């Protein structure tokens, strides 16, 4: 690892394997989290409207894996998204390409679309712009100094859980959720029927958070892989990669 990357994202120490880890996914009401205990088993689920509030509730977590782009480039497309798209092929629509930082600094969709075309030659979908608020929120947490945060993508994690094969069914379908839940259970992550308040969150978001937690556990064990390897870096040295 290069010195710039080490300065911001030193790999978890061996002792981190004895600490809980957390996976986080964005949902309609804010954020949902799944925590795994030291041995990688389900320890609890939580939800909050604001990510920083959720992070404050897990001070002992060694790693927090978030399903949200972390690390925005000054120009060009991120290698992480291109590689993740290839990994979940033929379901390429499950991954979106993240344009440069200036796009996300725009005041609204129309301005962001103009900036995106100027910088990349391509437009920005309204669906992608819909992530703007949460993307800014997550990056503010990491840029503000919480370097427990790592970017993950649940579909990449599920593909890894499936020995390189992406789940063929949509995460919102009965078949898709059954397969994803079984893949997690095969790793010892058994989600209970009663999740308390977090049980009000759509099941696909809970499953995504659990997959993120599986990746967080791998990061804590220093067994994770990154797309790309080694990660790209921002101009300030922050890593830009999807971990699984």
PLM features: residue spans?
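RNase H-like (RuvC/DEDD) metal-dependent nuclease/polynucleotide-processing core
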Residues: 2-8, 12-21, 26-244
